[in-house]
């Protein structure tokens, strides 16, 4: 009931008309201070994805998932796979595959994409699933990791609380995954747990 009331207060149509900096601060407040405290992570991230709260026209996964933002990474990943002899990538959270889909076109590796949002998993499976490409609903803070050589965890951890980051890293350490490739966002001077 509280979630419905809060959702009515922060209607997307209202937020979209605000200046960008105010919009992002309101969305951050809404998700980090209100939703994350009262709703399951799956509900929060499903709401973010369905309503395009990141406000990006190219990718529902947000501005960090655009082709421009990932250009260097897309060039570097094949080198990393060769250097570390990676045969299976576990990409979680995988998001909408906006940038990753180009690496999967002629993939010589096995790819497992995991995301907490079931709609994303279903859509990715329909559009990209094949013999060497699988998708699973997955919570990086709670679920046991599948067998893989590399966990790709890009632009995700800073959306979680410090305790959830620790849980994610504990799940990784409990797994047989050899390597982690992750990123963080250090541009937010106002971050609080």
What are these regions (language model features)?
Residues 2-148, 160-193:
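Class I (Rossmann-like) S-adenosyl-L-methionine-dependent methyltransferase catalytic domain
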Residues 152:
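A conserved beta-strand element that flanks and buttresses the S-adenosyl-L-methionine
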Residues 156:
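Hydrophobic adenine-recognition pocket in adenosine-nucleotide-binding enzymes
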């Amino acid at each position: 009931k509280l979630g419905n009331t809060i959702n009515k207060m922060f209607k997307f149509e209202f937020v979209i008309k605000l200046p960008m900096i105010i919009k992002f601060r309101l969305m951050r407040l809404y998700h980090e201070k209100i939703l994350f405290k009262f709703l399951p992570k799956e509900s929060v991230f499903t709401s973010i994805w369905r309503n395009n709260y990141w406000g990006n026209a190219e990718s529902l996964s947000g501005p960090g998932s655009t082709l421009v933002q990932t250009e260097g990474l897309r060039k570097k990943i094949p080198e990393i796979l060769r250097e570390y002899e990676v045969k299976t990538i576990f990409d979680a959270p995988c998001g909408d595959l906006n940038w990753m889909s180009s690496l999967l076109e002629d993939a010589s590796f096995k790819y497992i994409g995991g995301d907490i949002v079931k709609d994303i998993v279903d859509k990715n499976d329909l559009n990209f699933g094949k013999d060497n490409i699988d998708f699973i609903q997955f919570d990086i803070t709670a679920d046991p990791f599948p067998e893989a050589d590399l966990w790709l965890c890009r632009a995700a951890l800073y959306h979680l609380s410090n305790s959830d980051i620790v849980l994610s890293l504990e799940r990784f350490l409990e797994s047989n995954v050899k390597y982690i490739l992750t990123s963080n966002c250090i541009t937010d001077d106002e971050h609080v747990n």
